């Protein structure tokens, strides 16, 4: 409730000169006090509050340097607040299904770091979440969950970042996706022991999936997500990270090389390499034995040894590719990039 505004005092007729000195001094003190009060109010705001954005409807966008995605099939039961940098918070009550998070508009081999809190009551996941196209795949690297631990067709395990993850594959039929209602596979890495915070080296999961015959296509978005289903709860997560996680990317000296999957056959596979940060670059690729490189395109290639490729631009742009004969080793090569 607000008090009724006081009536404005009318100015005395005939006064057109300056205010008396005592009145001017009182007015100056009032202005200083008001400025101090405004400053203190600003300082009292929680970090990021001045840049916070509340989201309650399905959308994607960019906020404070990070991509975000908000999707729900039950509007009105979940909301998110986009905080400073990679921070976001969620609150949901008796919801249907939702996925909310911050990350990157284009995923890939990244070393993702995150911290925060995750407090579900019912079925929910705290997960690195993303999509690829051609093939269309929805993937999860699950670090924490509520009452239900996701499962599926067991494909093996991968040990990375201080823990062991079980690998599963499932299929969804005529379900919502980034390409509309489609039938598509889901890939899962589910940590055996829950945690809320740490590092996720995505390339190690991608390599383990590939060894199990679970191939990704070209990356769409990737977010550190909170997902809930017929549950209630809250989360507050801050995400960060760098490109080149695991065996598939590297940077230094002003450029970064990032690997992504190409076509795959029984005995060999293609990798695409994208270079950013410079058009005058040198990429060094180290191939794990006994795998070998069969061919390359869009580069000038030299071979310091049978397991090392040095690639330089040949006028075809900043993207090139290689065909690798795996010889029983499906682990992707590592790459590093330097300018000049």
Curated annotation (Swiss-Prot):
Q: Which residues form the GH11 domain?
A: 54-239
Question: Which EC class is the enzyme in?
Answer: hydrolase
One cellular component term (GO) for this entry is: extracellular region
Q: Assign the protein's first listed, main location to one coarse class.
A: secreted
**Active site: which residues?**
138 (nucleophile), 227 (proton donor)
Subcellular location as annotated: Secreted
- The signal sequence is 1-52
- pH behavior: Optimum pH is 6-7.
**So what EC number does this one have?**
3.2.1.8
InterPro entries membership: CBD2, CBM2/CBM3_carb-bd_dom_sf, CBM2_carb-bd_dom_sf, ConA-like_dom_sf, GH11/12, GH11_AS_1, GH11_AS_2, GH11_dom
Write out the similarity annotation: Belongs to the glycosyl hydrolase 11 (cellulase G) family.
Q: What is this protein called?
A: Endo-1,4-beta-xylanase B
List the lineage, top down: Bacteria, Bacillati, Actinomycetota, Actinomycetes, Kitasatosporales
Give me the gene this protein comes from: xynBS9
